[in-house]
């Protein structure tokens, strides 16, 4: 996919036509413009979600939805940049929305609350992935990994902590090393799901 390789800026009707070996104008028989093409692309990748039916365990299903969504965004880096807009309304997207709502049916809460929980998880995933993608872009641009950057700034950080002006920051840094992205994702996801569970009647947690 052009957007996967080169980003959305490289996605033009002419470029798509070249990839397909077709005339540019012939594409307009199928899609009206680039925005409509992107909506079709969003719906296509929504079909990569592996959650096919609700298991009855809301926590397990929401965690799976979050991990799947992160995976889709990382495989298609362009997707996170358009995910804040209007939701896609294609069949794959609507099916995933339906499954997500069904997965939360065992929460025993009203539809509005289900929507809020779903949005909280979804927006967390988007924000987390945007951070991951930004790190990758910096690494490609500078040739410096996040580990190498941390090592390079460590003397400065230690110098600042030694002043005693940042006791809370010092305790946080001294408590252990930074989590890698996978571990950080799971930690925050479980924190969110714990917060949701804490709002439920005991029998539904």
Per-region residue spans from a language model:
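Alpha-helical structural segments
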Residues: 1, 6, 36-51, 60, ...
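Helix-turn-helix
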Residues: 2-36, 40
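Short amphipathic alpha-helical interface segments enriched in basic and hydrophobic/aromatic residues
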Residues: 46, 50, 70-74, 105, ...
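Hydrophobic alpha-helical connector segments
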Residues: 50-95, 111-112, 118-121
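A contiguous pocket-lining binding segment that forms or flanks enzyme active sites
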Residues: 99-148, 152
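C-terminal peripheral helix-coil segments that are non-catalytic and often amphipathic
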Residues: 109, 134-205
């Amino acid at each position: 996919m052009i957007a996967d390789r080169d980003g959305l800026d490289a996605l033009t009707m002419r470029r798509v036509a070249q990839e397909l070996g077709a005339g540019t104008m012939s594409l307009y028989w199928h899609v009206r413009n680039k925005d409509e093409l992107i909506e079709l692309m969003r719906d296509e990748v929504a079909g990569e979600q592996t959650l096919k039916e609700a298991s009855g365990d809301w926590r397990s299903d929401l965690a799976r939805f979050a991990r799947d969504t992160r995976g889709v965004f990382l495989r298609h880096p362009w997707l996170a940049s358009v995910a804040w807009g209007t939701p896609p309304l294609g069949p794959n997207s609507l099916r995933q929305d339906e499954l997500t709502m069904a997965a939360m049916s065992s929460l025993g809460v009203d539809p509005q609350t289900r929507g809020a929980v779903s949005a909280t998880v979804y927006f967390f995933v988007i924000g987390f992935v945007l951070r991951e993608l930004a790190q990758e872009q910096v690494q490609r641009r500078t040739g410096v990994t996040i580990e190498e950057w941390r090592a390079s700034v460590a003397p400065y950080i230690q110098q600042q902590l030694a002043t005693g002006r940042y006791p809370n920051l010092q305790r946080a840094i001294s408590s252990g090393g930074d989590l890698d992205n996978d571990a950080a994702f799971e930690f925050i996801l479980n924190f969110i799901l714990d917060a949701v569970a804490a709002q439920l009647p005991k029998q539904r947690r």
